[in-house]
């Protein structure tokens, strides 16, 4: 029985090679310490990386992946690195779905186009959204709550000396760039955010829905789309995109009183294209759980002023220390709080730091390098779980 359980955990979180084979070994797959999962250091075809995930929700709603090597199915084809951070809400289903499908779609479209481009990335987002909509359609009658599950989606692709950053929601990618004149490493945000707390997002929503004075509502001092959700773009959240799912048997707290004729939320990603320069040192990809507690420059300073090995774990720790400070409690006490209850203090946090090696990036264009396929981990519960069901306990851990 124990062997079967361990096989299940390995199947959920073990890394795969591009051919689909699992790579065994705790160092390769990352390590678990209480609610913290981490991979302190690893080598990509474009440089080094560090990765960490800490769980706060009863069900881990953050999903993440690092893929490095072939970016298409063609031989020869473009080589590079793919980063994905998927911050789910309402449950883990959408984020898990993106983790299973986004990179596959990207490789498929890169094969068709014979290159990497914004069109390839946009089509991968669209195919992932359509795939999840199809899943909702199949499961709606038995599991209507799945229509109210969604995810932010942050993707980074490094290929042929270019960094593409595509985003839906409020995860963030921040570049650390060395400024020769001052000797400082300065933070530059590469991603656009889609959260109603920003005036420009509210204006965009109002322009798209001029006949709806309640398209954004200030509720308990927080701006929300239709009074329900803070983000304006996502994968999933079908109940705010297709009116046929905004009805019974969906729970009444998600249903709008009035019907709608066009989607309220969008799945169109904002895509930035950045030509990598020698003074571009690293990029921090993280869910909003990190950015709630650290500014862009604070995060960049931490990466710049500390060893690469374990830097993602260090960022998570500093964010948790800030969360504890805000609640006037000790970090050591916060670590003892189990998933579920922990969400009252901080969100799930995912951090992936990618160091940009100009030499490796130039060599990786079409030549084979080390292949990496890794997914962020956590305390896993059954894949079909929609609702928390365990009693929180006190944990002991060393991070």
UniProtKB/Swiss-Prot annotation:
Domain of life assignment: Eukaryota
Protein known as: Probable protein phosphatase 2C 28
Parts of the chain that traverse the membrane: none
GO molecular function: metal ion binding; protein serine/threonine phosphatase activity
Keywords from the UniProt entry: Hydrolase, Magnesium, Manganese, Metal-binding, Protein phosphatase
Protein family per UniProt: Belongs to the PP2C family.
Binding-site residues, Mn(2+) 1: 87-88
Reaction equation(s) it catalyzes: O-phospho-L-seryl-[protein] + H2O = L-seryl-[protein] + phosphate; O-phospho-L-threonyl-[protein] + H2O = L-threonyl-[protein] + phosphate
EC number(s) given by UniProt: 3.1.3.16
UniProt: Mn(2+) 2 binding residues: 87, 288, 347
Cofactor binding summary note: Binds 2 magnesium or manganese ions per subunit.
Disulfide bridge positions per record: none
Classification lineage: Eukaryota, Viridiplantae, Streptophyta, Embryophyta, Tracheophyta
Cofactor requirements of the protein: Mg(2+); Mn(2+)
Coiled-coil regions listed in the entry: none
GO biological process, one term: regulation of intracellular signal transduction
SMART domains cross-referenced by the UniProt entry: PP2Cc
Pfam families given in the database record: PP2C (PF00481)
Residue ranges occupied by any PPM-type phosphatase domain in the UniProt entry: 48-356
């Amino acid at each position: 029985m124990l062997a079967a359980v361990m096989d299940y955990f390995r199947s959920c979180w073990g890394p795969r090679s591009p051919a689909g084979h699992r790579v065994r070994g705790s160092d390769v797959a990352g390590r678990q310490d209480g609610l913290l999962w981490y991979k302190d250091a690893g080598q990509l075809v474009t440089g080094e990386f560090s990765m960490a995930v800490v769980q706060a929700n009863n069900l881990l709603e953050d999903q993440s992946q690092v893929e490095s090597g072939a970016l298409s199915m063609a031989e020869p084809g473009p080589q590079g690195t793919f980063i994905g951070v998927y911050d789910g809400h309402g449950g883990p289903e959408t984020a898990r779905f993106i983790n299973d499908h986004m990179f596959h779609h990207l490789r498929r479209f890169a094969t068709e186009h014979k290159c990497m481009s914004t069109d390839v990335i946009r089509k991968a987002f669209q195919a992932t959204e359509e795939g999840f909509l199809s899943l909702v359609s199949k499961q709606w009658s038995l599991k209507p709550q799945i229509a109210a599950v969604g995810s932010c989606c942050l993707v980074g692709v490094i290929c042929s000396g270019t960094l593409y950053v595509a985003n839906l929601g409020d995860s963030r990618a921040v570049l650390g760039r060395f400024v020769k004149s001052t000797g400082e490493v300065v933070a530059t945000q590469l991603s656009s955010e889609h959260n109603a707390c920003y005036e420009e997002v509210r204006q965009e929503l109002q322009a798209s829905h001029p006949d709806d004075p309640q398209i954004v509502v200030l509720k308990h001092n927080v701006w929300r789309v239709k009074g329900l959700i803070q983000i304006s773009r996502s994968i999933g959240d079908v109940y705010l995109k297709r009116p046929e799912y905004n009805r019974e048997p969906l729970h009444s707290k998600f249903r709008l009183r009035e019907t709608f004729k066009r989607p309220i939320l969008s799945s169109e990603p904002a895509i930035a294209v950045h030509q990598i320069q020698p003074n571009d040192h690293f990029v921090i990809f993280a869910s909003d759980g990190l950015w709630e507690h650290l500014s862009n420059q604070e995060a960049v300073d931490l990466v710049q002023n500390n060893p690469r090995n374990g830097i993602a774990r260090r960022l998570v720790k500093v964010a948790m220390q800030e969360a504890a400070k805000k609640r006037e409690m000790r970090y050591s006490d916060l670590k003892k709080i189990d998933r579920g209850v922990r969400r009252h203090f901080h969100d799930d946090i995912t951090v992936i730091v990618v160091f940009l090696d100009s030499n490796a990036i130039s060599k990786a264009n079409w030549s084979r390098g080390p292949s990496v396929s890794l997914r962020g981990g956590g305390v896993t519960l059954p894949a079909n779980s929609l609702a928390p069901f365990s009693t929180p306990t006190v944990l002991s851990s060393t991070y």
